[in-house]
Amino acid sequence: ARALGMPVLGICRGAQFINVFQGGTLCQNVTPLRVHTRHRPLLLPLQTVRLVADSGLRRWMQASVVGANRIHSQAIRRLGRDLRVVALDNDGFVQAVEGRDGPWLLGVQWHPEYLLYHAGHRGIFRAFVEAALNFKRSRLEPGPEGDSPILSKE
């Protein structure tokens, strides 16, 4: 997907895969390392997450602090190349990463698909769909007669 310029959204394990794919590492069990946050999985948005000021995530969620859920015990340890941290929890664990440049790339450690009743979490999906539509449009070219678009073969 990255090589083709496709937008990528990684949720929970997907965010971890993005980091590992980019050469980063994971902490296998953060539960005993937590000091300021709950040690059990939470489906409700009871975890406080702070968003970086100049990030796409903050712009899409239209907030500086959000509530998030947590269903994982792993976290990013060493950040992968060409990624930047855009959200942290109260224990300082990475909760979201974005690509530094290139195609649209976002990985969130929580599950926004369970929180669609919050406008900010819907904003993540709105931004992803917009990026996907822009990608699709960029791959369209006029047909042989110049009237009907076809996908380019590149």
Annotate the PLM regions.
Residues 28:
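Class I SAM-dependent methyltransferase SAM-binding "motif I" and its flanking Rossmann-like core
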Residues 1-25:
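Catalytic nucleophile loop
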